């Protein structure tokens, strides 16, 4: 598979599925670490919650997918290293993206954006970015449209 095709596929898959995986882990984190009653509030506003996660997470997820697609063959063919780089890259890219948005005051004008992007809610950004980066790096070779056949990545064990 050509590098440009792999970059397009990885970027799109990460952008579409990454924020959704992040929301799943964030909801589980809120349910187990915080009060379970907050989960009822989140379920009531789930469409808005998904929209916010996609608007704040799609671009960092896409950039993480492009980064994973551009990994050298030695690193990209090994599951552990690909997941490690995907997770760390997801966190770093998300934090850089949020720092840029905070400095652009027009985009961060609403109270909801300012609350999400504030330093107090660092765990709300780091956990979904880390876990979505790791999970997407792990399953990216199994998604349709990618002709990656590497013995190291073909088994899910």
Swiss-Prot record:
GO terms for cellular component: plasma membrane. It is a multi-pass membrane protein. It is found in: Cell inner membrane. Keywords: Cell inner membrane, Cell membrane, Membrane, Transmembrane, Transmembrane helix. The chain crosses the membrane at residues 12-32, 37-57, 84-104, 116-136. Residues 1-11, 58-83, 137-157 are cytoplasmic. Residues 33-36, 105-115 are periplasmic. Belongs to the CbrB family. This is Inner membrane protein CbrB.
């Amino acid at each position: 598979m050509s590098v440009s095709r792999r970059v397009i596929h990885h970027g799109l898959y990460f952008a579409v599925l990454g924020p959704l995986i992040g929301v799943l882990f964030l909801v589980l984190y809120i349910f187990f670490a915080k009060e379970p009653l907050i989960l009822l509030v989140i379920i009531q506003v789930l469409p808005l919650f998904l929209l916010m996660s996609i608007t704040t997470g799609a671009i960092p997820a896409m950039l993480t997918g492009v980064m994973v697609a551009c990994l050298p063959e030695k690193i990209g063919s090994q599951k552990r290293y690909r997941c490690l780089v995907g997770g760390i890259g997801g966190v770093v890219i998300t934090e850089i993206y949020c720092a840029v948005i905070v400095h652009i005051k027009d985009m961060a004008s609403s109270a909801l954006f300012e609350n999400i992007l504030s330093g107090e809610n660092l765990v709300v950004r780091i956990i979904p970015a880390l876990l979505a980066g790791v999970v997407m790096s792990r399953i990216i070779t199994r998604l349709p449209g990618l002709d990656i056949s590497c013995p190291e990545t073909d088994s899910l064990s």
